Amino acid sequence: MFLLLPFDSLIVNLLGISLTVLFTLLLVFIIVPAIFGVSFGIRKLYMKSLLKIFAWATLRMERGAKEKNHQLYKPYTNGIIAKDPTSLEEEIKEIRRSGSSKALDNTPEFELSDIFYFCRKGMETIMDDEVTKRFSAEELESWNLLSRTNYNFQYISLRLTVLWGLGVLIRYCFLLPLRIALAFTGISLLVVGTTVVGYLPNGRFKEFMSKHVHLMCYRICVRALTAIITYHDRENRPRNGGICVANHTSPIDVIILASDGYYAMVGQVHGGLMGVIQRAMVKACPHVWFERSEVKDRHLVAKRLTEHVQDKSKLPILIFPEGTCINNTSVMMFKKGSFEIGATVYPVAIKYDPQFGDAFWNSSKYGMVTYLLRMMTSWAIVCSVWYLPPMTREADEDAVQFANRVKSAIARQGGLVDLLWDGGLKREKVKDTFKEEQQKLYSKMIVGNHKDRSRS
């Protein structure tokens, strides 16, 4: 039989006491408040402390840059090229005026100087195109003491290096284990809780239990990210029989919204851990899961969604119409499918603060596990959520126009750039129709003017 020495026994006892104290603190200050939806203000105090540290770090770097007679790096938030919203015809007119006395109205034929317009546009796009930069992390104006964001902040003193090292210890040795424990607790409770609720007979009690199990587990998962969320205009929260649409930055958008409301999720059936969670959730709540073969069938998807929203007793559906994650600086084209089914749409704008941690999931660069590790080793996830008034499709509006109107409202409220480009360009090649459109505009300008002159 293995006997412990007195010293070994003391260490084991101290370790047991430490784990007991840690679990008790975890239960009292994080899990129980999450269950009841209350906060002791610890996260907000933590956020204010971080802001003071970041401000001090910025001052130190500015001083270091000044001593070396260098200018501290500042990102170009509005792009590196000043662009005026002018049409192709107006710009070519301007080029022709500056190059010769001929004007477009008098000379409908092609001029060699027209090439300069297309060359300039091509170079501008290569240097500062407004689409592809939406698929990479947003640049920071000041360093947040994360090594992954220290690409442009070079003037780091010894004090800053020590502070950064202390931050690494805190994030990886304290926050990461704590967050993993909370995430494991939240996911385990979600699977077990929804499975148990699934065996209850249908009725109000089952709905009540399902709602509170979902809210409790999502709130624990929110705390696993040290998420500090500010919800605005909560009287506009989505109601049964409607569709909640939001801009999409990250998979955690779902947790952010579901920790404040009760939604039916829409998505593809997965395997592995995600599949276990999906099967457990659908037992307690009427989520809409599609098989891989069904996802590409637009008519089947629309039919399932229409059947769901027509039943006013069912939960609002949560949908991200962009179809991919964008870096939270803009809102890109909304797919029209969810706007064709005639339901009331509840727009939601989500804006993250990248100063504490970048929530954007660059799926072409990072896998899910790597992404979650980056999230759990960030300082915090800070964001604001705005619930906008419900919107319905007008009589003279088609689905595309309605989708664009909702998108514009979300972009305006969240302070995001409203873009018409498809987020699918992250992975797909630009369609030839986009190139052909520019060719048509130019040929119409030349041929159209020539026809007008012939008629006269």
UniProtKB/Swiss-Prot annotation:
InterPro entries, per database record: LPCAT1-like (IPR045252), Plipid/glycerol_acylTrfase (IPR002123)
Keyword terms of this UniProt record: Acyltransferase, Endoplasmic reticulum, Glycoprotein, Lipid biosynthesis, Lipid metabolism, Membrane, Phospholipid biosynthesis, Phospholipid metabolism, Signal, Transferase, Transmembrane, Transmembrane helix
Activity regulation remarks: Inhibited by N-ethylmaleimide (NEM).
Transmembrane intervals: 156-176, 180-200
Enzyme Commission code: 2.3.1.15
GO molecular function: 1-acylglycerol-3-phosphate O-acyltransferase activity; glycerol-3-phosphate O-acyltransferase activity
Membrane topology: Multi-pass membrane protein
Swiss-Prot/TrEMBL catalytic activity: sn-glycerol 3-phosphate + an acyl-CoA = a 1-acyl-sn-glycero-3-phosphate + CoA; dodecanoyl-CoA + sn-glycerol 3-phosphate = 1-dodecanoyl-sn-glycerol 3-phosphate + CoA; sn-glycerol 3-phosphate + hexadecanoyl-CoA = 1-hexadecanoyl-sn-glycero-3-phosphate + CoA; sn-glycerol 3-phosphate + octadecanoyl-CoA = 1-octadecanoyl-sn-glycero-3-phosphate + CoA
Motif (HXXXXD motif): 248-253
Glycosylation sites: N247, N327, N328, N362
Protein name (record): Glycerol-3-phosphate acyltransferase 4
